[in-house]
Amino acid sequence: MANRFTSSDQTQETHGHHVDKHSFSGRQRHPSMGVHSFNEYMNEYPEAGPLVQEEEDDMESSSYHATQEDIGDDDSRSESTRNRSSQHTGRVNFSSLGGLGSIFGGKKSRSKSANGTQKKNANNNEEQLDEEEQNDPYLDRDISLLGSTI
């Protein structure tokens, strides 16, 4: 069988790019062929946008490395630092394990049934939670922190 393309038909110039008819046919690449480089991905999916870290995030991460004397001395803080710390970021940082323990440390009441399997003691569970809430010194703080993120 004779080749039906001549050498001049096998290649064509399209938008300044060399295109081989046998491999590309001048059409868009089929999605199942996969993306082989980041530039191809960005050309194929421009809605992905650039991967750029925001300046605010950069400034927040550098503030974690502050020394204790910088934290204690309010006069040495710059105006931009004060403004940034007063802005609400929507994040809640728990600095103590006590704060996390008061939220996640609740113990569930369980009792063994006659056949030896465990089940919740539903009758005493609500009463026990009320007593724990009254004795929890961190409850008010936790509720106020969670309320500010909503």
UniProtKB/Swiss-Prot annotation:
Gene name, Swiss-Prot/TrEMBL: mug108
Any GO CC annotation of this UniProt entry: cytosol
Swiss-Prot/TrEMBL keywords: Cytoplasm, Meiosis, Nucleus
Chain positions covered by the region annotation Disordered: 1-150
Name the UniProt record assigns to this protein: Meiotically up-regulated gene 108 protein
Top-rank lineage group of the source organism: Eukaryota
GO biological process, one term: meiotic cell cycle
Organism field: Schizosaccharomyces pombe (strain 972 / ATCC 24843) (Fission yeast)
Regions of compositional bias (Polar residues) in chain numbering: 1-11, 83-93
Function: Has a role in meiosis.
Main location: cytoplasm
Biased composition (Basic and acidic residues): 12-23
Places the protein is found: Cytoplasm; Nucleus
